[in-house]
Amino acid sequence: MVDKVPMTQGGFVKLQEELRWRQQEERPRIIEAIAEARAHGDLSENAEYHAAKEAQSHNEGRITELEDLTARAEVIDLTKMSGDKIKFGAKVKLVDEDTEEEKTYQIVGDQEADVKAGRISISSPIARALIGKEVGDSIEVNAPGGSKAYEILQVSWG
């Protein structure tokens, strides 16, 4: 069974754009760099050649990863999401019950997560604690710095 990878439309488009760039722009650039380095002679002590081959290996590995992710992508249409219970795609406003600090997060796929931008992975401890909860509920999250308690203030979509 192939596990689907949930993601937003925006996340899927970003993966497709990176895949296109790596295949159509980065791959030819690296091949050219390898050919140029090869022209410099002895490959055993040719740092440019070894660096280009390493870049090629990294790029091809990422292409394989992106092809797999886009093939297994389950694009979730956030415009069709609604309801009071928190699930994938929800924007959730929380208040830290100790510091009274408010935070807003959107629950997204693993590949889209960017905490600084307010996007947390569906598989993160805080997202797992939020799934199925509603406004007014409290959650407790075991974070690296200790346990944190939050109250859910708002749930929105889109």
From Swiss-Prot:
Superkingdom in the source lineage: Bacteria
Single GO biological process annotation from the record: DNA-templated transcription elongation
GO-annotated molecular function: DNA binding; RNA polymerase binding
Alphabetic keyword roster: DNA-binding, Transcription, Transcription regulation
InterPro entries (UniProt xref): GreA/GreB_C_sf, TF_GreA/GreB_CS, Tscrpt_elong_fac_GreA, Tscrpt_elong_fac_GreA/B, Tscrpt_elong_fac_GreA/B_C, Tscrpt_elong_fac_GreA/B_fam, Tscrpt_elong_fac_GreA/B_N, Tscrpt_elong_fac_GreA/B_N_sf
SUPFAM superfamilies: FKBP-like, GreA transcript cleavage protein, N-terminal domain
UniProt-listed Pfam families: GreA_GreB, GreA_GreB_N
Function of the protein: Necessary for efficient RNA polymerase transcription elongation past template-encoded arresting sites. The arresting sites in DNA have the property of trapping a certain fraction of elongating RNA polymerases that pass through, resulting in locked ternary complexes. Cleavage of the nascent transcript by cleavage factors such as GreA or GreB allows the resumption of elongation from the new 3'terminus. GreA releases sequences of 2 to 3 nucleotides.
Similarity section: Belongs to the GreA/GreB family.
Identification of the protein by name: Transcription elongation factor GreA
Organism name: Rhizobium etli (strain CIAT 652)
Gene that specifies this protein: greA
